[in-house]
Design a protein with these regions (language model features):
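Alpha-helix boundary/capping detector
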Residues: 33-35, 50-53, 57, 90-91, ...
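Short, surface-exposed, charged/polar-biased interaction segments
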Residues: 29, 41-52, 82, 94, ...
C-alpha cells in the first residue's frame, strides 16, 4: 500500500488527497478483478473467451502473413494480459510464440503453461530468446514480447521516461526487431466493462532495420 501511494504521488504530484485515495481504491478493485479473471481464464471455453475478449482489427496483420513475414507484437501488462496471450492464436493467421519468464515452482509452471497454450500459443522461455530468434520457423510467426517488465540486467536495459520518471525497460524486442527487420505492432487492450475487453493492433514500426537503438522501445 505504501508503494502504491508513493508511486501515485510521484507520478501525479498535483492530485488532492481525496483523489489519491480514490485512485488507490480503484486500483485495488481493478487488480482484484484482473487476478480473478486470470484464474477464470484457465478454464474458460473458446466461445466465452471470444465473446469477452474481442479483436477489432486482426486483418491488419494478414498482409504480413500472406508475404510470409514474421512480425513482433508488443502488448503490456495492462488490462487482462492473461486473456490476451491465451486468446491471441484464435483470430490470427500467424503462428504465435510468446517469450516469457517461467515461474519458479515447477508444478505451478507446468499447470499454467498447459492452460496458456491450449489454443495454440507456443511458450518460449526468455532464457532461450536468442536461440528462438536466430532459428525462426518456416511458418509466418508473431512473436509476443512483453517489454514493460523489469529487466534483470540494468546495464543492458533501455531507459525511457514513464510518468515523469526514468524507467528501465527490456531491450529484447527493440534489438531483435531491428536485427531481423520485423514489423512491430502494439496491442492496445481496452477494458469495455467488467469482464469484457477489446484489442486494437496499431503499427509501431514497419521499417525496424532503419531505426536507431531504443527508438522502438
Amino acid at each position: 500500500k505504501k508503494v502504491v501511494h508513493e508511486n501515485l504521488k510521484k507520478s501525479f504530484p498535483d492530485l488532492s488527497q481525496k483523489e489519491y485515495l480514490s485512485l488507490t481504491k480503484n486500483f485495488y478493485k481493478h487488480l482484484a478483478d484482473i487476478l480473478l479473471e486470470g484464474l477464470k481464464g484457465y478454464s474458460m471455453s473458446e466461445y466465452s473467451l471470444k465473446k469477452r475478449f474481442v479483436y477489432k482489427n486482426p486483418e491488419i496483420l494478414d498482409s504480413h502473413y500472406n508475404r510470409g513475414e514474421h512480425i513482433m507484437l508488443m502488448p503490456a501488462h495492462y488490462g487482462n494480459w492473461e486473456w490476451a496471450v491465451l486468446s491471441l492464436p484464435l483470430p490470427l493467421k500467424h503462428q504465435i510464440i510468446g517469450v516469457y519468464k517461467p515461474l519458479r515452482a515447477a508444478l505451478i509452471e507446468g499447470f499454467v503453461g498447459k492452460r496458456r497454450s491450449r489454443f495454440g500459443l507456443i511458450l518460449n522461455p526468455i532464457s532461450k530468446t536468442r536461440e528462438a530468434m536466430n532459428n525462426p520457423p518456416k511458418t509466418p510467426t508473431a512473436y509476443i514480447m512483453m517489454s514493460d517488465q523489469h529487466p534483470s540486467s540494468r546495464k543492458k536495459a533501455q531507459w525511457v521516461k514513464f510518468l515523469g520518471r526514468d524507467t528501465a525497460c527490456l531491450h529484447g524486442a527493440d534489438h531483435y526487431a531491428r536485427k531481423f527487420d520485423y514489423p512491430v505492432y502494439y496491442m492496445h487492450i481496452e477494458r469495455v466493462r467488467r469482464g469484457f475487453y477489446e484489442v486494437v493492433f496499431s503499427p509501431l514500426e514497419l521499417n525496424a532495420a532503419a531505426t536507431s537503438p531504443s527508438s522502438i522501445t
